[in-house]
């Protein structure tokens, strides 16, 4: 089916001015920051195998912060900006902004956001929020950078006229507008909205960072590179716009599926679940359109930019259907918090988005006059990256399934850690081809044959006159529909934030007022300092602080979290991953001496623990804690204290005030209303088989007991 497909043919013999300097600058910055971010990721992954390896480096959590922000803002941000400087003049027929504004944006993005942001998080100044780790001063600069990008790239489209825009233009406009709207929501709002209510806004940003920033710009690249490389129009302009509006209407509704079975109201969770399944259908439309647009190019296209774009489309289909599957409540119960989710995120950012980013940079770079490009190096990089990322994602997916199986049972937590070790080793090994692939792409841009002015920008310019002629037959009603849809899109974004952020906050506030046993217990100065240490070291990336409403969580960690428990948490630290156990009920479960020994040398207490040690918080031994260690201990001892003090009167009051006990997060006595710091009874211990021998008993002792008992 072809409807107005002539709009979608970015090939002609003329081109408006393209600022090659800014294309090159952002391209080189993209790969430089990518390699640094990958280095952080490798160091983070190696600690799963060698927990004491990075003692001379910043802590695991700090490097994890630097890794995620480096991938999203450093690598993808710069790659997308490089592509925009090339594509916007072609798509709009007008140059993008000004050279001076572009240089200011480049300096702001890299020398005021990325470098200071990395220095700050590695120095301990950060936010414990997923995809929002840079501290507030840097967040303000990021918002300013996005505003400058909008000023730089949006006016050419406005002057061009909405009714004649190609779909890549729409994705670019949508990304710039909606990222400006959503970034403050996930990076600023949780600092002022506590607990689960703040987590609702974080959940929206976790998904919008990918869905309204990364995905639209990646799809803009794919819809540009595919027809420019094949010399054919896209299969269907109608399907491309259907996919565009489906994405922007549904993505903002997905965020709360990151908190299924949490204390966030079930209505918000159900909305996100339904939207997640519908989004899967939209993705199938987008992917079908892009795949059919490549017909005749072969399974492995000869054009290297098209080859990366083609694999990006495949990754996009897999990761999107995987996301819809994860929204299923039964499946989420099994895999949430596991490495299955980490594999999913790597497939999104290092698979789909990264391959699209490479395709965009390569396509733009080879069209610039006097640019070098090593096609042999790019060919090797393609295969190394494809194999490496595939192995990494498959490995993490299997690890997540194994972890989920252990967590659903009654096996000790450490059993899941031991079972995960082989998968963590493979994950680190898979970083070798991935890193080599990225190095080769960077090398390819700096070596090889040079292009000439005659085969530079002219070879891929959009046929703007032809495109305009193709759209002059559109009816006034259809032209008006673009404007109506644009206004509706912004309105629907506001509606989604209200539905999944504002209304849940109000509901949680009402529940807190009705169910809280009394005024909130304020943290002491030492506990506040300890909370800051917990946040800066990234403890919430290993330990959640939410006991979900699942049988497995209740059996393992005790009574589920209630709305009022997080009413003083600014920002929340519910967490989105469990490498270690949940800590929401830590108070009074361990002795002071145990905690201090565990902080100083985790493996002296739990022999097979992979938790990082914090000897810098001590004066040379576990019995000589410095103030940081005592403050962190004070905070750990505060977790769950208020709930423990309120039991059982607080839960009885909750039952009296509501009929729908589970919906309002209250509990039933004896079945669920256990002491909140205690787990459910598990029955008699299984008898050892008659064939058990001394060697087996010794291994059990060594793995589980020797740390404390010598």
Residue ranges of each PLM-predicted region?
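Hydrophobic cores of alpha-helical transmembrane segments in multi-pass integral membrane proteins
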Residues: 24-49, 60-92, 99-123, 136-155, ...
